[in-house]
Amino acid sequence: MAKRIGLFLEKVGHTAIFDNEGKRIPVTLLHLRDSFIISTKTKDINGYNAVVLGVESSVNIKKPQLKILEKSNITAKCRIFESRVDNLDGIVKGAKISITHFVENQYIDVTGYSLGKGFAGVMKRHNFKGLKASHGVSIAHRSQGSTGQCQDPGRVYKGKKMAGHLGSSKVTVQNLKVILVDQERSLLVVKGNNIPGAKGSYVFVKDAVKKSVPKNSFPVCTEDLKLDNIV
């Protein structure tokens, strides 16, 4: 099936629910702010097919993004994202996308930026064992040890696991199950607490590439879904 639009949702936080058997299930809440289609990119012009999405935001918007919104006659403050698709059938400029784009019991892939943890040593960053706690080791218990060889090759190989910045990296978690779709609150309830990012951060949610895709089609623009400030 063709690749559908992926959406950018705000991470609200963690909680837990209980199923019919009384089993506790940890979940993560993702909120979809007002999202609509600003424009599209075609393979003939841009080299790939994509949908440019505007997501309502309360933070300050940079001038380049404001210019893009002005060209589309949009007065609302929106953050601009892009989602690649296989084809543009049924994509209409000005269509508002609902949280029902996803369905219950489907599987999704979530991409976000992990929490930054600053400069970390090799034991925390790469799970090194460390040196011995006694028997001659002095003030180097958490050291990484040797980093290379002798005169040949006389250098440290690229990609060597060493101390450095931990976190703040782009992470994708695959095959997360959608427990509930709350259309009234525009919430997506996802099983598990392993979605990357801090509270209030945006994550990219799309259909799981390793699981079956739901049969509902692309969102279709109707009169009641169009925003008033889009021409």
Swiss-Prot record:
- What GO molecular functions are on record for this protein? rRNA binding; structural constituent of ribosome
The answer to whether the entry has keyword Transcription is no
Under what name is this protein listed? Large ribosomal subunit protein uL3
Q: Looking at the keywords, is rRNA-binding present?
A: yes
User: Transmembrane residues, as ranges?
Assistant: none
Gene designation? rplC
Spell out the subunit comment: Part of the 50S ribosomal subunit. Forms a cluster with proteins L14 and L19.
Extract the HAMAP family matched here: Ribosomal_uL3_B
Q: Which cysteine pairs make disulfide bonds?
A: none
**Residue list for modification N5-methylglutamine:** 151
**Organism placement in taxonomy:** Bacteria, Pseudomonadati, Pseudomonadota, Alphaproteobacteria, Rickettsiales
The record ties this protein, via Pfam families, to:
Ribosomal_L3
**Cellular component annotations (GO), alphabetically ordered:** ribonucleoprotein complex; ribosome
Task: Check the record and name the InterPro entries matching this protein.
Answer: Ribosomal_uL3, Ribosomal_uL3_bac/org-type, Ribosomal_uL3_CS, Transl_B-barrel_sf
Which keywords are on file for this protein?
A: Methylation, Ribonucleoprotein, Ribosomal protein, RNA-binding, rRNA-binding
- Cited function: One of the primary rRNA binding proteins, it binds directly near the 3'-end of the 23S rRNA, where it nucleates assembly of the 50S subunit.
